[in-house]
Design a protein with these regions (language model features):
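S-adenosylmethionine/decaboxylated-SAM
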Residues: 4-167
Length: 167
């Protein structure tokens, strides 16, 4: 994730008291959110990776990725670890009212669609729905889901972050 992308997340976090991050990986974007929000970041991930990260994960012991995330975010008491598939975690946290949702999990059509449909019922009107890796030549499924479910989105200049205000 680029410095410009981290700066955008930090700015959004400063206006948000309840944030869900779907796809936390090693915690770099989680840090940008947690260090700049006056509230809580719910970090949602299986910490098992995807096929794209298979080679990197294969070099380590099971559980390594979550351990790395915890090490990288140590000392921040405003991060709630939600270990499991995004849709299941959304069901467990259905009572939340969210100011921001950041999607950087599975970039397939089904993955992005399910993340949007599962979490946006908790997003307050005017809240921020955004995500990472808007790359038209690479993530076709992500683009298809966005055009169907969040057609008013825009891409933040000089980044691959897509964003929209939720109505």
């Amino acid at each position: 994730m680029s410095d410009a992308e981290l700066t955008y997340l930090a700015e959004c976090a400063g206006k948000s008291t309840a944030i869900v991050e779907i796809g936390s990986w090693k915690g770099r974007s989680t840090l940008a959110l947690a260090c700049n929000t006056p509230g809580t970041v719910y970090a949602v991930d299986t910490w098992k990776g995807t096929e794209q990260q298979g080679d990197e994960l294969a070099q380590h012991e099971p559980g390594w990725l979550l351990t790395e995330f915890k090490r990288n975010t140590a000392g921040l008491d405003n991060i709630v670890i939600c270990e499991g598939p995004s849709v299941e975690m959304a069901k467990l946290h259905m009572g939340l009212t969210l100011d921001m949702i950041f999607i950087d999990g599975y970039h397939t059509y089904e993955g992005v669609r399910d993340d949007i449909l599962s979490w946006t019922p908790m997003l307050r009107p005017g809240g921020i729905l955004c995500g990472h890796d808007y790359v038209p030549t690479y993530w076709d499924g992500l683009l298809k889901a966005l055009h169907e479910l969040a057609p008013r989105f825009r891409v933040v200049p000089n980044t691959t972050i897509w964003t929209t205000e939720w109505l």
